[in-house]
Amino acid sequence: MRRFLTVQFALLALLVLAVPANASTLGQRVLEKGDRGDDVVTLQRILGMKGYSVGGADGVFGRRTKVAVKRFQRRRHLKADGRVGPATTRALARTWGVRTATYYGPGLYGNRTACGFTLRHRTRGVAHRSLPCGTRVPVYRNGLIAIFPVIDRGPHTSGVQLDLTHAAARKLGMRTTSAVRAGY
């Protein structure tokens, strides 16, 4: 019986260690080699957009991701330690244009978007006047970066360049019309 419990405990520990940490928004934690999760996927996609090869966005911060991060850090005159903290996260978005963004959603849930999606409470995406439907748009605000697909047309307010769904705005901590950096 004791051996059986020891084996069960070992299997449980293995499962717990194998489950990736799932901080889904880049900037919620410091990333380093060995980390896993959706935030690592976001990092890998952004590095790829900037021309740094990571071998694909698999969500595992491995050797190739660390090498790409260090190259990026050196080119931006940051401490090249291969870790992604607030300074590196800011630097990733620094070259993106500053845009005025607002959000939409409440009162429109259940309606179809211009790109064929049904808008729901948890739908994360952006509305843009001309980017093709499905284009991934990285957005930076409050030290956080997330990538959202274009799912609708808009915004329909003068002086606003980007419209986030309510769920996308919440993910970035946005509560009012705000300045964001967007990589398009």
Residue ranges and their predicted role:
Residues 1-23:
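Secretory targeting and sorting signals
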Residues 11, 47, 72, 76, ...:
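Alpha-helix boundary/capping residues
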Residues 12, 29-32, 78, 123, ...:
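Generic anion/oxyanion-binding catalytic loop in active/binding sites
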Residues 5, 15, 36, 160-161:
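Residues at the start of alpha-helices and the adjacent loop-to-helix junctions
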Residues 30-90:
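Short acidic, glycine/serine/threonine-rich helix-capping segments at coil-helix boundaries
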Residues 39, 90-184:
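Secreted/periplasmic proteins
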